[in-house]
Amino acid sequence: MEAERLNSLESLLADLTTRATELRRYLDFDVKSEKLDQVNGELEDPDVWNDQKRAQDLGKEKKSLEAIVHTLIKIDSELNDARDLFEMAREEKDEDTIVAIENDAQELLKLVEGMEFRRMFSNPMDANNCFIDIQAGAGGTEAQDWASMLLRQYLRYCERKGFKVEILEQSDGEVAGIKTATLKVEGDYAYGFLRTETGVHRLVRKSPFDSANGRHTSFSSLFVYPEVDDSIEIDINPADVRIDTYRASGAGGQHINKTDSAVRLTHGPSGIVVQCQNDRSQHRNKAEAWDMLKAKLFELEMRNRMSEQQKLEDSKTDVGWGHQIRSYVLDQSRIKDLRTNFETGNTKAVLDGDLDDFIAASLKQGV
């Protein structure tokens, strides 16, 4: 076995050990480990299930803590094993074991990089679930088809990340595609991963709806906002909200359109409109719609507080709702983020939900 290869593997293991130690420090391993024990203790108390909301919140907290604590324990354990095996394999010149350690080290590197990525989540709401609003721009069928492509893209992305995702509301286009859709995404750091996707997405392609096969440009907008938990008080005057019910239709509504189960809330002072038609129960749709309204009002307040600062920081104004963030030029096989300048030629993979590199670039650059 060549010395250079062994030295390289030894250096990688040493580097991973240093980074794992740093991870424990800035992810507050000791604090989170103690908190996990506390949460597990509460969940073992049979009386906790008398309060379903409290039990569910504890279950979510446990899952979030385990994602950090158990992963850090796994990294440390496997690193210790790899270092011990490496010393023995080097002495015995055991090629097969060295190859196995090299493979294990690459897997450990992915784990460490994944945990390091959490440092990018600087927004206090990053750990929350979130909602995604998709809206077709002007341009009729072409824009509505583009909106449906984005809907599919983000559904696939959420599946790849292991997030639970559901379509709360969808308004279909007259010929093809969708006019609007709202998704609810549940998972660890769902908002943190998706928040930089807010903005206008531009598509350039030869249109399948044009008999002359002409080149068309379409726009669709995304708005991502965090779910707000009960610890944050959002004061909504019921008198300011108009409640309409209607029969659900389209995806999510095929089996629930015999009664007026869909719910639309209109908040007068802000002009915000939310709607939910995902469930057969009008009561559950109404509860989900109120959660959406609460989340949108919270996000509106946060944006208002930041508006003066954003005016002063011209370099950051392109992250707003009304600005292009990404360009998809399909006939040139090029997708480019206009904020980070990251681009790729693998358009099929991106449209199939492979957004990790775009999101990583945005978070690293503080978009």
Curated annotation (Swiss-Prot):
Alphabetic keyword roster: Cytoplasm, Methylation, Protein biosynthesis
SMART domains referenced in this protein's UniProt entry, alphabetically: PCRF
SUPFAM superfamilies given in the database record: Release factor
Cellular compartments per GO CC: cytoplasm
Organism: Janthinobacterium sp. (strain Marseille) (Minibacterium massiliensis)
Compartment(s) of residence: Cytoplasm
N5-methylglutamine: modified positions: 254
Function comment: Peptide chain release factor 2 directs the termination of translation in response to the peptide chain termination codons UGA and UAA.
Domain of life per record: Bacteria
Family matches, as Pfam families: PCRF (PF03462), RF-1 (PF00472)
Post-translational changes noted in the entry: Methylated by PrmC. Methylation increases the termination efficiency of RF2.
GO molecular function: translation release factor activity, codon specific
Similarity annotation: Belongs to the prokaryotic/mitochondrial release factor family.
Protein name: Peptide chain release factor 2
